[in-house]
Amino acid sequence: MKPTPVRRILWVIAILIALGLLMAGLAQAQPVQITDDRGRAVALPRSPQRIVSLLPSLTESVCELEQCHRLVGVDRYSNWPDAVVGKLPKVGGGLDPSIEAIVALKPDVVLLSVSSRASDRLEALGLTVVALEPKTHADVRRVLGVVSDLLGVPRAQGSDRLWRVIDAGVQAAAQSLPPKAKNARVYFEVSRGPYAAGESSFIGESLARLGVRNVVPASLGPFPRLNPEFVVRANPDIIMIGNRSMQAMVPYPGWASMRAIRENRLCVFGPGDSDVVVRPGPR
């Protein structure tokens, strides 16, 4: 029977899909060599198939690169996507992980932050550790590339594609901002203290790309603890509050006099939205 044009198209699609799966499998079977954020070279005979992640942004990066099925354990704060919620063992936090629980999972690699104190102990037990810590927009793009390489996912189909989606989303958000909101002076509180997001933080970069001004200068560091009087003097147009700051919503002295409070210009993020805004990851 002579193939119809429709059948030819279906055959071509099937062949392309098969070739794509073959190439992906070959990439994952190749030796892997990367350098983590400690400057350490990590070499593996093949792409890791069993991964423990101790940092939510790295958990999300693995999943956004469509490799969530390789995760065998995560930290207690990894709560996205649904594929990891209640379905994977929790092995403690990034700073206080259960070494015994991690070892029992027999991971090919453990992903964690540079600041984690678990690196040396895990490596002493013979586990491979990759320490990555995105802190800026540029870091997010770079770390996505490293994770893509580690997973054997070609960057063109993995990290580069994902970054274009992220970047386009930020641009779209900036363009949707009402003209009267441009150059508004914003204070973003990440947790009680108050601890604020400065201009040099990941959040500060996001605010700048949206076209608003951060009242906390870069000279104070990425997440400085401020005297509440500092914020009163800054008198921001808008106050943004992360979920951690809502744990004890006791008014700070003098804040009732601020413009943002008087005019009820408060943006309070719930748990899910707060994670998206605060975590320097692919969401």
Please provide the spans of the model-predicted regions.
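Bacterial Sec-exported substrate-binding components of ABC uptake systems
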Residues: 2, 15-17, 24-59, 155-187
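A short, structured surface patch at a secondary-structure boundary
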Residues: 49-105, 109-115, 215
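Short helices/loops that flank or line small-molecule/ion binding pockets
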Residues: 99-107, 125, 226-235
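Sec-dependent N-terminal signal peptides
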Residues: 8-19
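Extracytoplasmic substrate-binding proteins
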Residues: 41, 109, 117-195, 213-218, ...
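A ligand-binding cleft/hinge motif common to bilobed small-molecule-binding domains
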Residues: 116-124, 238-258
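Short helix-initiation/N-cap motifs at beta->coil->alpha
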Residues: 37-39, 89-100, 219-228
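Alpha-helical, coiled-coil/dimerization segments enriched in small aliphatic residues
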Residues: 78, 197-223
